[in-house]
């Protein structure tokens, strides 16, 4: 408060939670979508996490069609979409069906593997990892890191540079500790949430021209000049 009162710029040297990162939202939305059996709300939380190859227009079209046709379960996603609603052009329905096929190519194998009731932690982690790879998440996070670097957002760039490794490390620990344990989807979600809630990223100061506030254990000062 004293620094703020005297308008002295400062940086608080502490690790930040990762829970607001799009990759974390992607993971949590995936799990909820499976648990909720592809409910309307869970599907659109997943689609709008910002890490899928869908345009805003494509997401809007899907949303309108799902609402209009009452598509709110995994079973309905597995069936071909051929019906129009509200006098919709049949050609538009063909485009919407193509979007469904694209998403099913991405999601079907992952969904079926994760829906196995007595799957082990290792099996669920493997399914999740392979799904992440198929979605090219690491490359997309790298692209975001480069964007933030180019726009001078050093803290964000640092976050995106660390987040993938943090999640992979969490997966490794889950396998090492509980790998052969059979867990339900809900139990797997609880394990994942517990790990993610503890995950933190280290952020570097955006500027050297400021007071650095930290503790003796974490903060290291090099080449100090007075």
Language model features with spans:
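Polyanion-engaging groove/track-forming segments
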Residues: 1-226
């Amino acid at each position: 408060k004293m620094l703020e009162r005297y308008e002295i710029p400062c940086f608080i040297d502490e690790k930040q939670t990762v829970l607001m990162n799009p990759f974390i939202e992607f993971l949590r939305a995936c799990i909820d979508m499976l648990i909720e059996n592809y409910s309307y709300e869970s599907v659109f939380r997943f689609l709008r996490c910002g890490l899928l190859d869908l345009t805003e227009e494509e997401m809007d079209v899907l949303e309108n069609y799902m609402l209009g046709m009452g598509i709110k379960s995994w079973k309905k996603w597995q069936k071909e979409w051929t019906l129009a609603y509200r006098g919709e052009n049949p050609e538009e329905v063909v485009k919407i069906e193509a979007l469904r096929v694209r998403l099913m190519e991405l999601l079907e194998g992952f969904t079926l593997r994760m829906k196995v009731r007595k799957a082990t932690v290792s099996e669920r982690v493997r399914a999740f990892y392979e799904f992440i790879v198929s979605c090219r998440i690491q490359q997309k996070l790298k692209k975001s890191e480069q964007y933030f670097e180019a726009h001078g957002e050093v803290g964000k760039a640092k976050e995106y540079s660390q987040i993938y490794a943090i999640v992979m490390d969490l997966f490794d620990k889950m396998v090492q500790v509980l790998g052969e344990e059979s867990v339900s989807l809900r139990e797997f979600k609880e394990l994942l949430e517990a790990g993610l809630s503890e995950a933190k990223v280290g952020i570097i100061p955006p500027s050297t021209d400021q007071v650095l506030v930290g503790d003796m254990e974490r903060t290291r000062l090099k080449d100090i000049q007075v």
